């Protein structure tokens, strides 16, 4: 799959989607995008910046949602112009899709909306690559149905990625079944692993979600070892002060050391090949 000017697939080095959960300010987005661009250039990683203009599925109605569509898109345009990196953001309503697709390079669908047929149809026909997140409630094999919905309407465009972000495991907890990454390859789409939302504890702090940040590198290494096309990580210079998902965000100043390990592991795994595919 051609993605933001590079090839994405299991036969390529993994690409990275990374940034703060919420676009808290223009300066934060520029700082994170600039830092990650430099890190990824040193490590030879294709990089896509991510942030959200609206967190429409917060645990509590009193939680901060974001700066909104207009300001968010203005900030994303500045990231593209000043930093020179592609931008991904998530859309939560069909009405937002045209405006978002006119600005950003990649659209993402929230996990909770992966079975909403009209929504999937709308985002699949927006003319941009789409990262479809697997719902926490969905079996990995069921993502084929989701991808089939997208392909029904996108005129054969090779623009769909699928993303694993953990599965519900009792109340307020998620678990990552690494088999799902191999199973989701059967969709024929590049598979992305979300290493930070996978350690989230949904609603675990009452009115907000908790998280187990210490397990981010554990799951990231495991996913790379299985074999993936892309890695998704939320990062923040001060996770404790992040507007959202701070407990499961990886500190910005620790990204390079973790990514260096993952690059070496990715190279070793892909050089050796995958026995299950032989």
Swiss-Prot record:
HAMAP family: KDO8P_synth. Belongs to the KdsA family. Coiled coil: none annotated. It comes from the Bacteria. GO terms for cellular component: cytoplasm. Pfam families: DAHP_synth_1. One of its GO terms (biological process) is keto-3-deoxy-D-manno-octulosonic acid biosynthetic process. Its EC number is 2.5.1.55. This is 2-dehydro-3-deoxyphosphooctonate aldolase. The lineage of its organism: Bacteria, Pseudomonadati, Pseudomonadota, Betaproteobacteria, Rhodocyclales. Keywords: Cytoplasm, Lipopolysaccharide biosynthesis, Transferase. InterPro entries: Aldolase_TIM, DAHP1/KDSA, KDO8P_synthase. One of its GO terms (molecular function) is 3-deoxy-8-phosphooctulonate synthase activity. The keyword Transferase applies. Pathway: Carbohydrate biosynthesis; 3-deoxy-D-manno-octulosonate biosynthesis; 3-deoxy-D-manno-octulosonate from D-ribulose 5-phosphate: step 2/3; Bacterial outer membrane biogenesis; lipopolysaccharide biosynthesis. It catalyses: D-arabinose 5-phosphate + phosphoenolpyruvate + H2O = 3-deoxy-alpha-D-manno-2-octulosonate-8-phosphate + phosphate. It is found in: Cytoplasm.
């Amino acid at each position: 799959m051609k993605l933001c000017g590079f090839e994405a697939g299991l036969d390529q080095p993994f690409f990275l989607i990374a940034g703060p959960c919420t676009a808290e300010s223009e300066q934060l987005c520029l700082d994170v995008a600039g830092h990650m661009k430099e890190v990824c250039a040193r490590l030879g990683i294709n990089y896509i910046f991510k942030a959200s203009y609206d967190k429409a599925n917060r645990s509590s109605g009193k939680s901060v949602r974001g700066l909104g569509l207009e300001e968010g898109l203005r900030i994303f345009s500045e990231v593209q112009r000043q930093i020179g990196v592609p931008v991904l953001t998530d859309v939560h309503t069909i009405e937002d899709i045209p405006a978002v697709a006119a600005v950003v390079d990649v659209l993402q669908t929230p996990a909770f909306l992966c079975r909403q047929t009209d929504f999937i149809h709308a985002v699949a026909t927006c003319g941009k690559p789409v990262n479809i997140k697997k719902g926490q409630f969905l079996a990995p094999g069921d993502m084929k149905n989701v991808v089939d919905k997208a392909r029904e309407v996108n005129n054969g465009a090779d623009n769909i990625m699928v993303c694993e972000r953990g599965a519900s495991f009792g109340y307020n907890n998620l678990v990552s079944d690494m088999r799902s990454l191999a199973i989701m390859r059967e969709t024929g789409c590049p598979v992305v692993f979300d290493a930070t939302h996978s350690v989230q504890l949904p609603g675990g702090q009452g009115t907000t979600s908790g998280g187990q940040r210490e397990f981010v590198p554990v799951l990231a290494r495991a996913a790379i070892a299985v074999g993936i096309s892309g890695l998704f990580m939320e990062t923040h210079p001060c996770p404790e002060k992040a507007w959202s998902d701070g407990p499961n965000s990886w500190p910005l100043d620790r990204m390079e050391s973790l990514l260096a390990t993952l690059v070496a592991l990715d190279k070793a795994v892909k050089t050796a090949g995958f026995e299950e595919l032989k």
